[in-house]
């Protein structure tokens, strides 16, 4: 799996449903607040520094970006959510687009929700997790930027989030600690994603 995911390459970007690639194979989508470290997580998972653009301006990703791992397997970078500078009409467009993507996309096999370990489970995070659970999709939460906390603080946050997720979603959502800086949890996350994509 680790070698396969490192083959990820940019495939295409979609601004609306008509631009989506054929609904076949397997896809894993990545969602997260605009400053949660989603692009950095994608880069760490694929061991590529510039696969997903890391922007100084949160909310820069304004389309669904597809990265091809194999001809039958893709990673999908969803627009960062919760950023105030994105106009309301554009927010509404993305909400409708993502809603339709989740409701109709047969290739979608799992959702990774990226959350800053210091500020987990915001309303937007819960909304994305609910999308997945309602569709019967497995979801996996990455508590990113773990290197900002001590090991004991990491475990304390992990236990708290795990308890909340279990209460809200049962066994539908798993969670782990993650850091792109020191590569904490990279192999664990790759294992989850590889299983969903059929690469294991």
UniProtKB/Swiss-Prot annotation:
Residues 24-199 form the EngB-type G domain. SUPFAM superfamilies: P-loop containing nucleoside triphosphate hydrolases. GO terms for molecular function: GTP binding; metal ion binding. One of its GO terms (biological process) is division septum assembly. Its cofactor is Mg(2+). GTP binds at residues 32-39, 59-63, 77-80, 144-147, 178-180. CDD domains: YihA_EngB. GO terms for cellular component: cytosol. Keywords: Cell cycle, Cell division, GTP-binding, Magnesium, Metal-binding, Nucleotide-binding, Septation. Mg(2+) binds at residues 39, 61. Belongs to the TRAFAC class TrmE-Era-EngA-EngB-Septin-like GTPase superfamily. EngB GTPase family. Necessary for normal cell division and for the maintenance of normal septation. This is Probable GTP-binding protein EngB. It comes from Stenotrophomonas maltophilia (strain K279a). The lineage of its organism: Bacteria, Pseudomonadati, Pseudomonadota, Gammaproteobacteria, Lysobacterales. The gene is engB.
């Amino acid at each position: 799996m680790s070698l396969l995911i490192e083959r990820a390459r940019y495939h295409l970007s979609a601004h609306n449903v008509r631009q989506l690639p054929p609904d076949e194979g397997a896809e894993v989508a990545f969602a997260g607040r605009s400053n949660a470290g989603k692009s950095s997580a994608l880069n760490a998972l694929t061991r590529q520094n510039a696969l997903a653009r890391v922007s100084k301006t949160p909310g820069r990703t304004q389309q669904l970006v597809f990265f091809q791992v194999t001809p039958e397997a893709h990673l999908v970078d969803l627009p960062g959510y919760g950023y105030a500078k994105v106009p309301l009409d554009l927010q509404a467009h993305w909400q409708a687009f993502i809603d339709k993507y989740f409701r109709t996309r047969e290739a979608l096999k799992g959702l990774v929700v990226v959350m800053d370990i210091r500020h987990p489970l915001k309303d937007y995070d819960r909304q994305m997790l609910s999308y997945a659970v309602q569709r019967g999709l497995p979801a996996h939460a990455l508590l990113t930027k773990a290197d900002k906390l001590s090991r004991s603080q990491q475990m304390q946050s992990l236990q708290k989030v795990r308890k909340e997720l279990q209460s809200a979603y049962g066994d539908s959502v798993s969670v782990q600690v993650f850091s792109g800086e020191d590569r904490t949890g990279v192999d664990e996350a790759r294992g989850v994603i590889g299983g969903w994509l059929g690469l294991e």
